[in-house]
């Protein structure tokens, strides 16, 4: 089996832009394996030269040319990184010129605009949504639950918490979640805490076999992780969703990104930034 291809995400800020676009591209090659290295805040020539050394060392040690996804605004730093022995995709260099041509104006280049706290409204909306999701995780509180944009329901370990946090971080959505426990699943009614907010409910389900694997890691060889328990809980949860007309999605083969977009569309939610 061939060794994984080395991939470098290089950015003068957080690296999120390079990672997000790079991952979207690499995911189209599911038959290959990659080893990822992220280098954020490469914002000085010295840092850029240090990264170039690491990339070149990787080329020498692995015998394959690394792939580098670069999100750097500064021309000098980009020139230094270009000296690395790697196949490089530079997002600003690739797309900025095309956009300048289409808009018939030169960009006012600044490294402060992307992923910056300078955009106060965007930052505040994100932090408010994250705090809301954390305060309403796993049904811990119904205080101000009426302010939720969406309330995710599902059995334990069906993906509720990461989906809520992703919705909050990426879209500013106030997402709460409620775990369906055996008492809830045995009832014909909706859980008391979320019943007043039926129109905000969205269900998450999962294949029992996948659920068992996740639970087995958390509580090995417990009744909680038995396959018959998982099958029963998943079936009962889906019956509840159908009985009350609650839309739901299967998380088994969906990334959190795909799931979040699906929820936005199904619930007709609009991002806050």
Swiss-Prot record:
Q: What EC designation does it have?
A: 2.7.11.33, 2.7.4.28
Which reaction equation describes what this protein catalyses? [pyruvate, water dikinase] + ADP = [pyruvate, water dikinase]-phosphate + AMP + H(+); [pyruvate, water dikinase]-phosphate + phosphate + H(+) = [pyruvate, water dikinase] + diphosphate
Q: Does the keyword Ion transport apply?
A: no
The positions making up the signal sequence are none
**Protein origin, superkingdom:** Bacteria
Q: Which GO terms describe its molecular function?
A: ADP binding; ATP binding; phosphotransferase activity, phosphate group as acceptor; protein serine/threonine kinase activity
UniProt keyword list: Kinase, Nucleotide-binding, Serine/threonine-protein kinase, Transferase
Which family is annotated?
Belongs to the pyruvate, phosphate/water dikinase regulatory protein family. PSRP subfamily.
Q: Which NCBIfam families match?
A: PRK05339.1
Name of the molecule in the record:
Putative phosphoenolpyruvate synthase regulatory protein
User: Which organism does this record belong to?
Assistant: Neisseria gonorrhoeae (strain ATCC 700825 / FA 1090)
């Amino acid at each position: 089996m061939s060794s994984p291809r080395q991939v470098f995400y290089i950015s003068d800020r957080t690296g999120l832009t390079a990672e997000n676009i790079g991952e979207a591209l690499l995911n189209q090659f599911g038959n290959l394996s990659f080893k990822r290295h992220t280098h954020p805040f490469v914002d000085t020539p010295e840092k850029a030269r240090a990264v170039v050394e690491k990339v070149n060392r990787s080329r020498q040690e692995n015998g394959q040319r690394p792939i580098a996804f670069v999100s750097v605004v500064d021309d000098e730093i980009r020139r230094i990184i270009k000296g690395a022995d790697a196949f490089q995709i530079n997002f600003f260099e690739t797309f900025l010129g095309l956009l300048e041509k289409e808009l018939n104006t030169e960009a006012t280049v600044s490294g402060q605009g992307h992923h910056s706290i300078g955009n106060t409204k965007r930052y505040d909306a994100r932090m408010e949504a994250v705090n809301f999701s954390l305060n309403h995780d796993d049904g811990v509180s119904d205080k101000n639950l009426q302010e939720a944009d969406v309330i995710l329901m599902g059995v334990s370990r069906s993906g509720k918490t990461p989906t809520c946090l992703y919705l909050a971080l990426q879209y500013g959505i106030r997402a709460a979640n409620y775990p369906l426990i055996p008492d809830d699943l045995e009832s014909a009614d909706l859980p008391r805490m979320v019943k007043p907010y039926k129109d905000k409910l969205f269900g998450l389900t999962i294949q029992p076999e996948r659920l068992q694997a996740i639970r087995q890691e958390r509580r090995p060889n417990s009744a909680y992780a038995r396959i018959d328990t998982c099958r029963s809980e998943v079936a009962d949860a889906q019956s509840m969703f159908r009985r009350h007309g609650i839309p739901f999605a299967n998380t088994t083969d969906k990334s959190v990104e795909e799931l979040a977009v699906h929820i936005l569309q199904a619930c007709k939610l609009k991002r806050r930034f």
